[in-house]
Structure formats: structure tokens, C-alpha cells
Amino acid sequence: MKIAVINGGTRSGGNTDVLAEKAVQGFDAEHIYLQKYPIQPIEDLRHAQGGFRPVQDDYDSIIERILQCHILIFATPIYWFGMSGTLKLFIDRWSQTLRDPRFPDFKQQMSVKQAYVIAVGGDNPKIKGLPLIQQFEHIFHFMGMSFKGYVLGEGNRPGDILRDHQALSAASRLLKRSDAI
């Protein structure tokens, strides 16, 4: 089973990275650090004559990579009680891909994937991060994806996540449950 960690963090080696690494320890996983790729915001042309136009950025290459994977882990810091703008920008572009003739089976291809979420925040994330988890539930439901689990960790400054033993333990078990892989 191929695994991709789609990381929306913007701090290299930050708390989100640490928790995501813990989750895939012992597995062969591809890490896609979205901040390293130029991705343009969506220009909503769903109802315009001619529809969406091709965009010259790295988005399509990332889509091609994740379509090859069976398990997708969406990792993000919790910024202002939601996912990072970097990750949101990537997911927003799915609206374009759903209508892109180069990806005619995008929704169907995504529907067979197992999805997980890892999120880290500094302001009571195990409560205040729940609306973010619900947002991902809706995203995955719309795409027909199987939402298998999540971990919410607490950390603000670099390295803080190492004190959240509950989150570290949950991350280490995330893919090891009997219904995963």
C-alpha cells in the first residue's frame, strides 16, 4: 500500500512534521511538503464560458502523485481554528480537477483511498480542532473517501509536540489499527 503524507505545514521540522513522521514510522511513505511547490489559488470559472483554464504551477504533478497512493494523510498545523492556507489552497483546487478532462476519473480514483488527518495547534486543539476534523469529514464524504482516523496534537513552539504523549502514542498507532493497510 502506497502512503502519501500531504503536509500543509509551513515550518520545516515543526510540530506537524514530527507528529506526521511518528504516524508513518516503519512505513514507506512519500512526504509531499506543499510549501515547497508553487500552487496558484483557484479562479472559480465553473460557470464561465469555457470553464477552467489550465494553470501553470506544480498542482497537477502533486495530484498525479497522490492518485498513485492508497492512503492519504493530511497533516496541518491548526491556524485560526482551521487548516493551513497552504493545505486549503491545495484542496480548493480539487474543484478544478473535478472538471479537468485530463483527470476524467478524479473523484472515482479518490473514492478508493483511505484518508487520515493529523493536526497540531496550541490553543486547546483537542476541542477547538474538532471543527477542522468535521470539515475534513465533509470533504472526504463528498469525494467518497474512507475517513479512517485522526490525531489532534498540542504544540505551539517547535518541539512542543514532544510533550503531548497522548498524541504521540495515537500517531504511532494510527496506521497500525486492524482496518488500516
UniProtKB/Swiss-Prot annotation:
Cofactors that this protein relies on: FMN
Molecular functions (GO terms): oxidoreductase activity
Enzyme Commission number(s) of this protein: 1.-.-.-
Keywords from the UniProt entry: Flavoprotein, FMN, NAD, NADP, Oxidoreductase
Entry's family note: Belongs to the SsuE family.
Function of the molecule: Putative NADPH-dependent oxidoreductase.
Protein name, as recorded: Putative NAD(P)H-dependent FMN-containing oxidoreductase YwqN
Gene source species: Bacillus subtilis (strain 168)
